[in-house]
Amino acid sequence: MATDELATKLSRRLQMEGEGGGETPEQPGLNGAAAAAAGAPDEAAEALGSADCELSAKLLRRADLNQGIGEPQSPSRRVFNPYTEFKEFSRKQIKDMEKMFKQYDAGRDGFIDLMELKLMMEKLGAPQTHLGLKNMIKEVDEDFDSKLSFREFLLIFRKAAAGELQEDSGLCVLARLSEIDVSSEGVKGAKSFFEAKVQAINVSSRFEEEIKAEQEERKKQAEEMKQRKAAFKELQSTFK
């Protein structure tokens, strides 16, 4: 494999440099300035050696992973920036989601496990069965560790916003119930939310009424046109 060969070459090169003590043979024909530059490579050599070591370590780790040695880094352990990865949400929305995540992360380990999710759903007023909780985690569990990282928690709201969750699924219920955080929004926030819902329903009803009125008007016009045609034909027949 090319990766193994490159890693071997880098390791051998580092070993040879270590045995040689970093000495460089004097090259004939160099003038004074060039000789001075060639004789003072300490910082550059140190930086190059550090970069070589880092690259060698990465290549060796990749070779180990390809051979089934070592464990790959799980997505939940990777550092990510929620503001750049989840651009569809505002900073305030992400902050609210983070606050909710930390509220139910009782173990303070950066994850919401099965029992913590069970407690969350009970406090939201939508208790789930053991199997239901497992299915909730499974739907966004990218690294298959049977618990939710903050990134996976954000995926719930991304899927909900995109309409990718079934209406009766536990994750959809979680996203819907967490729209109103009574502890921060208070009764006023809940009131304004439901008023907005009622207003949206009223607007929808008015829209439906307008459509029905237009349909009735078209029917009336069609009936009048039909009657005029019949009258015209009757008038024509009298002149034959």
Curated annotation (Swiss-Prot):
Cellular localisation: Membrane raft
One GO molecular-function entry: cadherin binding
CC annotations in GO: membrane raft
Residues covered by the EF-hand domain: 92-127, 128-163
Nucleotide-binding keyword on record: no
Residue numbers of Phosphoserine PTMs: 11, 74, 76
UniProt keywords, alphabetically: Acetylation, Calcium, Membrane, Metal-binding, Phosphoprotein, Repeat
Role description: May regulate B-cell receptor (BCR)-induced immature and primary B-cell apoptosis. Plays a role as negative regulator of the canonical NF-kappa-B-activating branch. Controls spontaneous apoptosis through the regulation of BCL2L1 abundance.
Subunit structure: Interacts with CASP9; with inactive form.
Name of the protein in question: EF-hand domain-containing protein D2
Species the sequence originates in: Homo sapiens (Human)
